Each structure stands twice: as structure tokens, then as C-alpha cells.
Amino acid sequence: MSLTRRDFIKANAVAATAAAAGIATPAIAQPAKANIRWDKGVCRFCGTGCAVLVGVQDGRVVATQGDPDSPVNRGLNCIKGYFLSKIMYGEDRLTKPLLRMKNGKFDKNGEFQPISWDQAFDIMAEKWKEQLKKPDGVTRVGMFGSGQWTIWEGYAASKLFKAGFRSNNLDPNARHCMASAVAGFMRTFGIDEPMGCYDDIEQTDAFVLWGSNMAEMHPILWSRVTDRRLTHEGCKVAVLSTFEHRSFELADIPMVFTPQTDLAILNYICHYIISKNAYDKDFIEKHVNFKKGATDIGYGLRPTHALEKDQANAATPDKSDPMTFDEFKAFVAEYTLEKVAKLSGVPADKLEALAKLYADPKVKVVSFWTMGFNQHARGTWVNNMIYNVHLLMGKISEPGNSPFSLTGQPSACGTAREVGTFAHRLPADMVVMNDKHREITEGLWKLPPGTLNPKIGYHAVLQHRMLKDGKLNAYWVMCTNNMQTAPNMNEEGYPGYRNPANFIVVSDPYPTVTALAADLILPTAMWMEKEGAYGNAERRTQFWRQQVKAPGEAKSDLWQIMEFSKRFKIEEVWPEELLAKKPELRGKTLFDVLYKNGQVDKFPATDIQAGFENDEAKAFGFYPQKGLFEEYASFGRGHAHDLAPFEAYHKARGLRWPVVDGKETLWRFREGYDPYVKAGEGVKFYGKPDGKAWIFALPYQPAAESPDKEFDLWLSTGRVLEHWHSGSMTRRVPELHKSVPNAVLYMHPNDAAKRNLRNGDVVKVASRRGEVTTRIDTRGRNKPPEGLVFMPFFDESQLVNKLTLDATCPISKETDYKKCAVKVSKA
């Protein structure tokens, strides 16, 4: 057999990745099968946005490989990516709607029984209409969506809830992972998403990882970081975390810090830069304003919680006041090397080495962060504070100098953020609270003035609280496993799902923990069973075509949303005063008003490329993906969120927005790279009215819950390489499941010895909210310091979120999954 260079690279990559995971080389590394049709696609997992080639034979995805023509992954995939072909074929795949029934009727305490789609939508419509007819009906219906939705699925859902039902109770699971990043961008720059791109990796001199285990969570990007570190003379890697993990293997400056003290470390770096007179005076004068942020903001817990008492700014956590550079200098001056070393537990020499990296004007620095920053009771603050460091030095918006927020889901950027599926957002960074933004949206959606609700809806954690309290009663969960992944499951999650006043619908391909807690389960088409689009962490939008059909009666989220809208006459959901403004809408359905509006339905099904299925086009008689995308794209064109025409994405390996005159943008806010920065402006942070970014003075504050005499250990939760999020896909891939079949509790050997425990012992882990049973691992890949334990959340047999606290960042409303107090004892 002869191998091309491409085949050789691919086979070696597969073998190396499989070997690293300790599993056998998969069949896809073997010679290709005959008669396979290959087409381009996008990986279903993390926010890196790796491109893949998808092989189809006899109506089934039989193989995938990294796309050699992709500028993101350059033909490589991580171990999860190499098994993509198996994620849709779990033995327990759902193929029919299932309703809890007893004696032939719906019963909240009944057993799941198969029903038809008509029956499913009948009872859904009944439950929704029952709530919507109440005086406060718009607050009693809600939806929890996903950063795994395709762009048009999120957009269609936003139209249905925010325009159709006039309810802003739509929030995505990206609230749990990216909301702090969004709030950080908006506060500092007035506009969302990174200014840099992955090309920064090959052009920088130093990498600093803040709360990010890229080696396991973004392994393809880590391979590029590793290559740069090993081939670029003098390149340095600094890694900061609350425990040691695989990314530490490459670290020149490894730092394990006490939870929450990253706030102090960031202020120390600013103090060092200023005290050494290293800051870029000209850049600061031209491009920066200084702000003192509000403190006493609480921890996002229920108002009755003790930590929320006497918090002066709990209602206005986002407010700030102007300050001068000298005032900022005085503010950070108290964060001395000695003080921060003692507080954080990081040796002084390492803190100083880190500060010197940032302070050296000749060293280009890329700062990467993920959940360690974002899932933080002060998550917005730490996002603001890393920008402080880069702005002081002017190390921003140019090749190799970039503060870079990495995303965890494949379209947390493209769908949750850009489309605006958060409870307060509209497309293209607009918000429901802004009169002008609502007016623009109503115009583009052809709605009567006053249709959109100006009141912010319930965010993710608040949705669970409102379900429990009986104030949110008709609830639809799509493309996410929130019962397993939301915090404080025992006290705030499960009670709301089982509240007799509520009707819970879950759309999912598999019987997840969330699905099994619902009243109605809708079987969902997956990944290559529908046409899709994702937007990755570097603003790259990528498309794929439907490759195969979904099994049985499973339907895409897009079909479900649009088909359900047919069940509502406009008179059933809108008040008379709205209808009077646009009487031609009388008698129409929400489907007619939202999706058959002359814009979404303007493209015929014949526009679909020959040889490919499109089940939604077949069902509706037009090309809904194209119509929805073009309507959505009209929000951002001319407003620094420009997307290319629909057809361009099926031809390209993704394009990074803004795309102006067919050209993508690699670096934002800097002249010569960004088309929205005019000649002579140099740098312009045009999200702010005066073009200046904000540096914030924000203090160190303790965590919402810290260890004490009884609960004497910190608990941090997260992921491992082999599994993704709740494991609903990866645990159904035999090779991945066998490699890591169960979660374990990673513990320092000394902490184990104090409790008379040995490696592999079965233990009980308890917090103030619940307990789980697991095994301890004192020799594994993750090495916590004494006083901290780490446990992944992929294992549905060990629901670690029974333990976690539902504290959130009061600004972003994102949960702090990294810090709560537990105790461990032998089971």
C-alpha cells in the first residue's frame, strides 16, 4: 500500500492521540473504505472550531478525519475528534417523542410512553397557552438553549420567544461558561468577542494561561502553542491554576495559587508595571479611560442568603465611576509582591517573573483563559483585570499581543453570543433594555412597534429558582444537559423539574439526566443529520451540509422550533394594542409572522446543493437555513459584525468576522487590520463612544464559600481530555468510555493520608448541599495541592453538581463551579 504525505500525517496523528489516551488505534486510521463520500464539516465538541472531513457510506457516517486544508487544526484532531463518527450511534438513541403517562393520559408521576409528534405539540401548546393567557404569562414560559445550537437554531429560538411569546426568558448554557467573558468584553471595550485570532500563537514570545488547561481542553491549539514554545528561541510559557495539570508539563513559570487570589495577582502585575515605569504612556493617554468599579455587590445567591445582606451595590453591580491614572496607581500600590505572595501562596520569584513578562516592551504576550476565570464569583472582574494588564502595556490588537478568551462550546460565540440568545441580548451586541435596539430589531423582524419586551428575562440560575418557586411553569430545554451540569442540583435544580405546577420539555438525542427528569422528551437530530453553522473562539463562522438522515422520528431543533410555532394564532399570544398597529397579521400563526415573513422564506429549496438532503427545506417548502442566516446577518452588516453572504461559507474553511468586501478581519481595533479603523486613527476601541477602552480598579475579595473546620477542602470541578461536558456523547463512544469509564476525585497524597485513605479507595464527598460517592486518585494526571480536590462532571453516575454552590458573578450571572467547601471520608 502506498501512502501520500497527507495519509501519513493523518495516520500518525491518530496513532499518537490514541496512544496518549491509552486506547487502541481506531479503524479510521486504517486504509479508507471504498465508495465513501467525503465532505467538509466542523467538529461537534469544543470552541476551537476544528474542521473535519466527514465520510458517509450507505446513509451512515462511517469515518471522520482532520481537514488538512483547515487553517485551525491543519489536519489534526484530538482524541474526541477522531471518534466523531460514533457519537450519533449510541444504542439508546431516542427515536420517538416520549410523554409521562398513566391510564392513557399525561401524568406528572407516570412512566414515559411513546406518542406522535402531533400529540407532543398538542400538549405543549396546551401548557404554553395556559400560562400565556395569565396576566404575567410572558414570565411564566421559558427556554434553556445552547452554545451547541447551530446559528440558525439559536436565531429561530430567539425569534419564537422574544418576538412570538414576547418573553425574554431565553438563556443558553453559555451562561455557565462564557457570560463573564461577554460582560468583560462589554465593560472594557463596549463590544463582544476577541480582538485577536489563532494566528497570534505563531507570532508571540510568551503565553500565559489563566485558569485554562489547554493541554486537555483545547489540545489542538495546545499543539500549536507547544510548537511555538519549542521552536521560537526565548519563548516562555506561564501557567496559573489552583491545581497542577497537564499544561504544567510545558510551563517555564508554573504557579499554583489559592482559589480567588487571581484577583490579587492581577493587581500586583499592574502595580509592578506602573512602579517600574514600564507602562505605555502614549497608548494610555490616547486609548484608555480609568474607572473605579462598584464593590459590595454580593455573590448572586438568593436575596435571603446571608451573603446578600447589606450589599450596597447588589442591584447595580455593573456601575463604575471615573478615576484618574494616579488614583488607579494608588489603588494597585497596596498589592505589593510580599502581600500577594503571602495571600496567593505563589513564591515571590515566580510572581515577579510573570510580571516581568508582561512589563517587558520587547516581549509579545498572549494571555489565554477559560473557565478558571469565567466560572468565578468575580468572573467579570478578572476578565476586566487581564485587559488592564494588556492595556497598560499597549499589548493588544496586534499580531502576537493578545488577551484571548477561549470558548468551551462549538458555537458559544456564533450562536449564544452573536445571535443573542441570552436573556438580555438581541443580535449583534444589542440588548432588550435599549429602546433603539428594540426598535431596530422590530423593524428587521417586521414587527409592530412595542412588540419586544424591555424587561430582562430569567438567566440560567434564576430559571431554576423560578421553576422551584412555581413562577416559571412551561419550560423547554434544548441541546443541553442542565440537570447534570447546573449548580446545586439538590436544592435548586431537581425540585423545579418535579414541581407539579410545571411542565418540562427536553429535546435531546439521548435519555440524559435532564431528559429523564422531564415530562416530555422530544427526539432530536444530531450534528451531521442536519445542515449547520458554528462560530468559534476566533470569530470564525463555519458551515456544513446535512450528510445523513436522523433515525426514526428524530427531528432537528430547528424543525421543532418552527413547527411548534404553527400551533399559535397571533391573537393567542399578542395583546389587542399590538394587533391594532398591524391588523394585516390577524389570523396568522407565529410561523407565518416569524418564519414565512417574506425574508426567511425567500430562498427556494432548489438553492440547496444537488446531492444533499435538507429535511427542514423538505418540510417547509423553502430553504430556512439560508433565509434565517441572511435575515440575521442584516443586523451586523455595517456595524462591525459583518458576515459574508451565505454561499461563501459553504465554499470556505470558515471566515472571521467582520467580513468586509469579501475580506476577513484577523485583528480588530487596529489600523491596517480592521476595516472599521480609519487611516490615521491607529487604535480605536469603537465599541465605546469615544473610542477608548476602560481600565478598572477592582479589589481582591474572598470566595462565596471557603473551607472551614467541618468542610475543610476546596472543591473545583471541570473536565478531562477524553470526555466532553456531561459525557452524553463521549460516554456512548466505546473507546472513549473505556479509556476513562468513571470520574474520580483527585486528591493530594497528604490529604488522603490524614484521612487514612489510599489511592483507589471509595469515599463520600459531602458539601452543605449534598453528597456523592466516588474513588480517590492520588497519582493521576491532576495534582491538587493540599487542601483542594478536583472532580470532573462528565459522569452521570456521580453527579458532582449535587455539591456545588449556586453562587454567581453578580454582573455576568455566571456560576462559580471552581470554589466551594467539601469534606471527604471513607465510604
Swiss-Prot record:
<protein>
    <recommendedName>
        <fullName>Periplasmic nitrate reductase</fullName>
        <ecNumber>1.9.6.1</ecNumber>
    </recommendedName>
</protein>
<feature type="binding site">
    <location>
        <begin position="241"/>
        <end position="245"/>
    </location>
    <ligand>
        <name>Mo-bis(molybdopterin guanine dinucleotide)</name>
    </ligand>
</feature>
<feature type="binding site">
    <location>
        <position position="557"/>
    </location>
    <ligand>
        <name>Mo-bis(molybdopterin guanine dinucleotide)</name>
    </ligand>
</feature>
<feature type="binding site">
    <location>
        <position position="148"/>
    </location>
    <ligand>
        <name>Mo-bis(molybdopterin guanine dinucleotide)</name>
    </ligand>
</feature>
<keyword id="KW-0411">Iron-sulfur</keyword>
<feature type="binding site">
    <location>
        <position position="173"/>
    </location>
    <ligand>
        <name>Mo-bis(molybdopterin guanine dinucleotide)</name>
    </ligand>
</feature>
<comment type="similarity">
    <text>Belongs to the prokaryotic molybdopterin-containing oxidoreductase family. NasA/NapA/NarB subfamily.</text>
</comment>
<keyword id="KW-0408">Iron</keyword>
<dbReference type="GO" id="GO:0009325">
    <property type="term" value="C:nitrate reductase complex"/>
</dbReference>
<feature type="domain" description="4Fe-4S Mo/W bis-MGD-type">
    <location>
        <begin position="36"/>
        <end position="92"/>
    </location>
</feature>
<feature type="binding site">
    <location>
        <position position="530"/>
    </location>
    <ligand>
        <name>Mo-bis(molybdopterin guanine dinucleotide)</name>
    </ligand>
</feature>
<dbReference type="InterPro" id="IPR006311">
    <property type="entry name" value="TAT_signal"/>
</dbReference>
<keyword id="KW-0004">4Fe-4S</keyword>
<dbReference type="GO" id="GO:0030151">
    <property type="term" value="F:molybdenum ion binding"/>
</dbReference>
<keyword id="KW-0574">Periplasm</keyword>
<feature type="binding site">
    <location>
        <position position="801"/>
    </location>
    <ligand>
        <name>Mo-bis(molybdopterin guanine dinucleotide)</name>
    </ligand>
</feature>
<dbReference type="InterPro" id="IPR006963">
    <property type="entry name" value="Mopterin_OxRdtase_4Fe-4S_dom"/>
</dbReference>
<dbReference type="GO" id="GO:0045333">
    <property type="term" value="P:cellular respiration"/>
</dbReference>
<feature type="binding site">
    <location>
        <position position="371"/>
    </location>
    <ligand>
        <name>Mo-bis(molybdopterin guanine dinucleotide)</name>
    </ligand>
</feature>
<keyword id="KW-0732">Signal</keyword>
<feature type="binding site">
    <location>
        <position position="818"/>
    </location>
    <ligand>
        <name>Mo-bis(molybdopterin guanine dinucleotide)</name>
    </ligand>
</feature>
<feature type="binding site">
    <location>
        <position position="43"/>
    </location>
    <ligand>
        <name>[4Fe-4S] cluster</name>
    </ligand>
</feature>
<dbReference type="GO" id="GO:0050140">
    <property type="term" value="F:nitrate reductase (cytochrome) activity"/>
</dbReference>
<keyword id="KW-0534">Nitrate assimilation</keyword>
<feature type="binding site">
    <location>
        <position position="793"/>
    </location>
    <ligand>
        <name>substrate</name>
    </ligand>
</feature>
<keyword id="KW-0813">Transport</keyword>
<feature type="binding site">
    <location>
        <position position="46"/>
    </location>
    <ligand>
        <name>[4Fe-4S] cluster</name>
    </ligand>
</feature>
<dbReference type="GO" id="GO:0042597">
    <property type="term" value="C:periplasmic space"/>
</dbReference>
<dbReference type="GO" id="GO:0051539">
    <property type="term" value="F:4 iron, 4 sulfur cluster binding"/>
</dbReference>
<keyword id="KW-0249">Electron transport</keyword>
<comment type="function">
    <text>Catalytic subunit of the periplasmic nitrate reductase complex NapAB. Receives electrons from NapB and catalyzes the reduction of nitrate to nitrite.</text>
</comment>
<dbReference type="InterPro" id="IPR006656">
    <property type="entry name" value="Mopterin_OxRdtase"/>
</dbReference>
<dbReference type="InterPro" id="IPR050123">
    <property type="entry name" value="Prok_molybdopt-oxidoreductase"/>
</dbReference>
<dbReference type="Pfam" id="PF01568">
    <property type="entry name" value="Molydop_binding"/>
</dbReference>
<keyword id="KW-0560">Oxidoreductase</keyword>
<keyword id="KW-0479">Metal-binding</keyword>
<feature type="binding site">
    <location>
        <begin position="210"/>
        <end position="217"/>
    </location>
    <ligand>
        <name>Mo-bis(molybdopterin guanine dinucleotide)</name>
    </ligand>
</feature>
<dbReference type="GO" id="GO:0042128">
    <property type="term" value="P:nitrate assimilation"/>
</dbReference>
<dbReference type="InterPro" id="IPR041957">
    <property type="entry name" value="CT_Nitrate-R-NapA-like"/>
</dbReference>
<dbReference type="InterPro" id="IPR019546">
    <property type="entry name" value="TAT_signal_bac_arc"/>
</dbReference>
<feature type="binding site">
    <location>
        <begin position="717"/>
        <end position="726"/>
    </location>
    <ligand>
        <name>Mo-bis(molybdopterin guanine dinucleotide)</name>
    </ligand>
</feature>
<comment type="subunit">
    <text>Component of the periplasmic nitrate reductase NapAB complex composed of NapA and NapB.</text>
</comment>
